[in-house]
């Protein structure tokens, strides 16, 4: 039986989750909710994408429906998740991708509206976080609301797991050089919580905070308190890169570290962690479905216990693919 899902929030992640889900035979997208997007506009936004290109199938709007390749998807425009008719529509799982309802209290409204389970596509202050390839095996069916963590945590955690499992991490610092996201400004504007974040996105390198490294401690308890990090927002539309600098417990050569990562990418983390020895740049990873692609040529080792590792990620498409993977895992575990 198909996994019946609804998507709340038809932004960058919501639309790409839909693209990915349409390619999975075991998933049926029943409905989309976004208070700011009517069916005809939803069709336009789904069909045309400045970053990932035009959708190759047929996309139209018909009444209250978004129609993709003949498949009808209900479009609701409710501001309050409690009012979305998930139950009446037969939706079992909700992908919460507004970026607003990231806590248990807000996400619970989807359950109240008839959904059985919710996956939040953002870090959560109180919902359990899962990263595919790292700790999804810890999921238990009694959990109704979970978080897929952030795109950066999804990039960092698989890399940190391999390094920690093989050599041990004493402590580390992470910097993500991160593409523009929707929260940034096209020109200088007010941003009271983050003054730098209010500066023109297209013309600046903007230092910012991120909880991605600390969140790794939630999905790999052994690393709790051992990692922290920051973000540099740069004027690219998509694809980001993690710079992880760590002190190792066990001495190793750079070649040994790279080989351990390569082995994991071909084994237990296949499809999640990638590996490349090519002379790549950011656009080479547009549309990549990996969470993290280790760049063997870009890292450096200062001493046998002090190393910098570089890993790329499509912060939109790779993350959206993992959301759908986590959904399938949850559905299977809950069956």
Curated annotation (Swiss-Prot):
This is Glyceraldehyde-3-phosphate dehydrogenase. GO terms for biological process: cell wall organization; glucose metabolic process; glycolytic process. It is an enzyme of class 1 (oxidoreductase). Its main location: cytoplasm. Its EC number is 1.2.1.12. Homotetramer. D-glyceraldehyde 3-phosphate binds at residues 150-152, 181, 210-211, 233. InterPro entries: GlycerAld/Erythrose_P_DH (IPR020831), GlycerAld_3-P_DH_AS (IPR020830), GlycerAld_3-P_DH_cat (IPR020829), GlycerAld_3-P_DH_NAD(P)-bd (IPR020828), Glyceraldehyde-3-P_DH_1 (IPR006424), NAD(P)-bd_dom_sf (IPR036291). The active site is at 151 (nucleophile). The lineage of its organism: Eukaryota, Fungi, Dikarya, Ascomycota, Saccharomycotina.
